[in-house]
Amino acid sequence: MISFAPFLSPEAIKHLQENERYSDQSQKRTAQQIEAIYTSGQNILVSASAGSGKTFVMVERILDKILRGVSIDRLFISTFTVKAATELRERIENKLYSQIAQTTDFQMKVYLTEQLQSLCQADIGTMDAFAQKVVSRYGYSIGISSQFRIMQDKAEQDVLKQEVFSKLFSEFMNQKEAPVFRALVKNFSGNCKDTSAFRELVYTCYSFSQSTENPKIWLQENFLSAAKTYQRLEDIPDHDIELLLLAMQDTANQLRDVTDMEDYGQLTKAGSRSAKYTKHLTIIEKLSDWVRDFKCLYGKAGLDRLIRDVTDLIPSGNDVTVSKVKYPVFKTLHQKLKQFRHLETILMYQKDCFPLLEQLQDFVLVFSEAYLAVKIQESAFEFSDIAHFAIKILEENTDIRQSYQQHYHEVMVDEYQDNNHMQERLLTLLSNGHNRFMVGDIKQSIYRFRQADPQIFNQKFRDYQKKPEQGKVILLKENFRSQSEVLNVSNAVFSHLMDESVGDVSYDEQHQLIAGSHAQTVPYLDRRAQLLLYNSDKDDGNAPSDSEGISFSEVTIVAKEIIKLHNDKGVPFEDITLLVSSRTRNDIISHTFNQYGIPIVTDGGQQNYLKSVEVMVMLDTLRTINNPRNDYALVALLRSPMFAFDEDDLARIALQKDNELDKDCLYDKIQRAVIGRGAHPELIHDTLLGKLNVFLKTLKSWRRYAKLGSLYDLIWKIFNDRFYFDFVASQAKAEQAQANLYALALRANQFEKSGYKGLYRFIKMIDKVLETQNDLADVEVAAPKQAVNLMTIHKSKGLQFPYVFILNCDKRFSMTDIHKSFILNRQHGIGIKYLADIKGLLGETTLNSVKVSMETLPYQLNKQELRLATLSEQMRLLYVAMTRAEKKVYFIGKASKSKSQDITDPKKLGKLLPLALREQLLTFQDWLLAIADIFSTEDLYFDVRFIEDSDLTQESVGRLQTPQLLNPDDLKDNRQSETIARALDMLEAVSQLNANYEAAIHLPTVRTPSQLKATYEPLLEPIGVDIIEKSSRSLSDFTLPHFSKKAKVEASHIGSALHQLMQVLPLSKPINQQTLLDALRGIDSNEEVKTALDLKKIESFFCDTSLGQFFQTYQKHLYREAPFAILKLDPISQEEYVLRGIIDAYFLFDDHIVLVDYKTDKYKQPIELKKRYQQQLELYAEALTQTYKLPVTKRYLVLMGGGKPEIVEV
C-alpha cells in the first residue's frame, strides 16, 4: 500500500518558497509559481503574463497531484486547441517517465506506470472533444442517438440551412402577418426577390445565439432587450452619458493645453486678453461647469438641452491652429454630439421597427428549431449543438452531473481568457464549486471572432480580489522569455495605451512584465526596438492597389534588415519571424524574399489550393476536355506551358472566323485554321499549323480516354503526355506545386470512390466550391528548417522567436462589422438600422415615400460597444505580437514624413493617451507614433526612423553572404574533376543496365536489409536509380587518388561505434557524460572515431526524449544488437534466399513488441530518412513477428545525424 504525501498547507508553501529563494539552483521557481503549483482546496485563477511559464506551472501542478495520489483520470484538463492538448499530454508523459526513472520505491513505480498507461484515456483535450464524450455516453437521456457524426464541412451545413430557410421563408410570406414580414425583409434586402441580405441576417443571429449558454432562452429573453428598454431619451445608459461628459472634459483639458502653449497668443500687443483666448476660456469654463454640475443643471431629462447648448458653444470646425499646426481639439466631441443630436427624431420612428424585430425574433426561433430537427433526423450535428446537448444532459440529470462533480478532483482550464459563455456554463456544471484551476491572460484574449469573451476572465479576477472566499488570484508577472529590450518597450507602449476602457484591463504594476532572470537584464544596445517607416512622400506607386496591403518598399526594408542580421551577426534564418495580421495579400513578401535569396516558409492553413497556378491550369484542361467550346478554359490551356501558344498565335487563330456565323467559338476557329478554311488562312504559318495539329491530336486522345478511364488515370495521362508534372519541378516552389498536382489526382480518385463518376460531375463540384467563395486547404509539404517564418499573429500565440518583425503596421483595423445594417450584443440583443419613411416629417406630398436609414438607439449602443471591443482586441493583438520576441522587435510601416506632426502638447497629460485619441487612431503605427509624440520626454525604448528610396537601392540593401559549404583544406573534394564525375556516372549507368538482366544469375544466397532498402530508394529520389547489389562477386572499383593530406573519419565507422556504445551502455545508472565516457572505453574503435561521437547528443536522447526514458524504464524488456535470419522470395528471379541482419534494439512485452533503430545519416528533413528506411524496418518487424508470433505495434527511428536527436515513428 502506497503512503501518499498530503497536500501542502499555506505555511508549508511559504516554507517551500523561502527554501527556493535561498537555494543554489540555476533555475529557480518564483514564489508565485510555487503558490500556483501547490495551493489546493479552493478555486484558483492564475493571471499569467506572456512568457511567465504557465504551461510549466500546469504540468508541475498535475504531476504534484499525481504524486499525492490523485489519479490522472480524476483531473479534467481543458485546452484551447487539439495541438495544445497533444503537447500537454507529451509533457506530462515525459515527466512521468522521468519520475519513474528516479523513483526507487517499487510500488510507486507500479503506480506511476499505471498513470502512464491511463494518460491516453485521461480527459485532456478541448471542450468540444469532452462534450462529444458526454453526448456519446448519455445522449439517450435527452433523446439523442450516440451514433452521431460531426458536420465539419461548411458546404454541407450551408445546404441544410438553405433548405430550412427557403421552406420557412415561403411559410412566413403567406402567413397572417405577411405585410410586417415583407417590411422586415425589405428593410434589409431592399425587396422580397433578393433575400440574400435577410438570409445572412438570420444565419448570423442563429450563429451568435449558439455561443450563448442557452440559445433558445437568449433569443426569447435577450434578443429584444435593448429594443424594449431604450425607447426614450431618459433610457440612455449612464455609461453612454458618462462617455459624453468625459469627451466634454477631455475637450476642455486639451483646449487648456493648447491655450497654454507659448506660441498661442493669449494677449494682444496692448497686453489685454485676445478675443480668441477669451472665447476659448469661456468654452473651457462652461464645459467644465456643465460636466461637474450635470445632475443639477440638466440630468437625464435635460440631455437634449445639454446637447443643444454644447453644439451652440463650440465651433463647427475640429481644429485649433497654433503656429500653423492644427490640433484636432473638438473632433471627438463633435463625433459624440453627432451620436446624440438626432436621437429625438430617431426615437420617434424607432417604435415603428419593433413589430419588425418581433417578426425577426419569431423567424430565428423557428429557424433554429427546424434546423436542429433536420440535423437530428440526419444524426449529424455541429460542434455547438454537441456542447448544448452536453449542457442539457448535465442540467437535467442530477445524478449524471453529480457523478462528474464527484469524479473530478479538479477542473483545470488553459487559455481561460478565450472561453465563451457556453464553455463557461459547461465548466461550472462539472465543478463542485471550489475545485477550479483557471490559467490565462486577459491581455492575450484575441479570439472575439469565435465569440470568446475576455470579460469572463475579468469578472472572475474582480470577484476573487473582492471576495477571497470565492477563490484566489495568483499573478505570474515574471517573464522568462524575452530580453529587457523587449520587456521595456512592451511596458512603455502598453502603460500609455491599455486600460479598462480600451483593452479591458489596466496595464498597471500588476500586469507589467518583469525579467525572470538576471541574464535577461543584460543590456544590448543593438537590440533596441525599431519603428521603421517607409517615407511615402515620394511614393512611386509601389503599393498594391488595395492600400491595406503591404508595399514592396516595406518588404524591402524587412529584407535589408534580415540581410544585415544574417551577414553581420550570423543570425540563422529560422530565428527570424514575420508577423502579419491576416493570411491574405502576402504574396509580395514571398516574391521579394525570393529576389533576395532569403528562404521563407508560411504557417500554412491557407485555403488557396484551387487558386494555385498549376491547379488552375489543370482544372482548365479538364474543363476543355469536358467542353472544348468553353473559350475561357481553352485559351488558358493553349497559353499554358503544355502548349505554349503566345498572343500572336491566338490573334491569328481568332481571325479565322466564319463570316456566316454570328457566334463562333475559338475551338471552331482552330478546326477551320487546320484545314485552311478560315477567313484568313494565310495567317496560319507552318509552325503554328504544327502546334495546332499537336494540340488537336492530344485533346482528341484525352477526350477519348476520359470516356473510358478513371479521373485519376486521366490526370496522370495529361501529366505524362505533356510532361507538365516534370515542368513544374523546374519552377519556383516546385515541391509545393508537385504536391498540389499529385493531390488533385488523389482528390479526383477520392471523388469517384465516394460514388460520383465522370469528369462533368467533378468539374461541377469544383465550380460549386469556387462559386460559394470557398476553397480547399493547401497541401502541406515538408518546409525547410533554415528559413524565415511568416505567420499570422493569431498563429504565433504561445510561440516565441528571437527576432520578430511586425509587418503592415499602417494597416487600418477592420471596422466593417460596425457599419453593417445590424449589430448583435450579448446583453442588449439586436440593434438595427431602420429604413424609416419620413415623408410626413418633411411635409412631402409629391413623392410616395421618403426613406431614410436611421441608426436606432440599440444600434448606436451596440455600435459603440463593438467599436471599443474591436479596438481592445487589436490592442491585445499588438501585445501578443510584441511579446513573441526574445531579443528584438521591429515594427514596419509606411507614413508621410512631411505630414507627421505633434498630436498635442505633452504638458498636463496623464500616463495614458487620451481616450478620445485612442478611439480615433486606427492602426498600430498611429498608436506608436502618438506615444512617441506625446511622451517624447520619456525613454520609450523604441526609435522611429523614416526610410527613403535611396536607402532601398540594390547596393544599399546588399546581398546575402553564402557560407562556404566545403572545407577549403579538403583538396580532394575541391579538385575532383567533372571528367571523373562523368566517368563514374557512366560506370554506374552500365552497372545498372547489366543488373537489370542478371537478377536470377547473380542472386546471392544471403542478403541484408540494408541491401534491400536500396530497392525502394528509386521511389524516393527524383533523379537517378539505385539498384541493389545482385551478386556476391566483387565489382570493378575505380579508386580515385587521395589528394587530401589528412584522413577523414568515415561516417560508417561513426555509425558502428554508436551501435557498439548503445549495446554496452548500462541503463541501470543515470545517463550522464561520465557514464557515457566509461562505456566508450569498452568499445572496439580507434580514438579518432571515439572522439567524433557526439556524447552530448546521446545524453540528450536518454534525458530529454520520452523514448530515451522508455529505454531506462523498461530495460528488463530490452534486447540490443540481436541477430536474425529469415527466408525470403526474390520478386525478379522467383528464387529463395536467406535474409540476415542485426536489429539495433527491441522491447519484448507479453502482447506486443516495440522496435527501435538508430541512424547517423545526415539529413535536412526527418521525412527523408523515414521514407528511406521504412522498408528496412518492415523487414525487421517481419522477422520479429515470425520469431515471437507477436505484433510489432511501434517502430521508431532514432536520428542522430542532425543538430539534436529526433524520434520518428515509422
From Swiss-Prot:
GO annotation, biological process: double-strand break repair via homologous recombination
InterPro entries assigned to the protein according to its UniProt record, in alphabetical order: AddA, DNA_helicase_UvrD-like_C, DNA_helicase_UvrD/REP, P-loop_NTPase, PDDEXK-like_dom_sf, PDDEXK_AddAB-type, Restrct_endonuc-II-like, UvrD-like_ATP-bd
Keyword set includes DNA-binding: yes
Disulfide cysteine pairs (residue numbers): none
Catalytic activity: Couples ATP hydrolysis with the unwinding of duplex DNA by translocating in the 3'-5' direction; ATP + H2O = ADP + phosphate + H(+)
Source species, domain of life: Bacteria
Record's subunit section: Heterodimer of AddA and AddB/RexB.
Protein name as catalogued: ATP-dependent helicase/nuclease subunit A
Organism: Streptococcus pyogenes serotype M5 (strain Manfredo)
Gene, per the UniProt record: addA
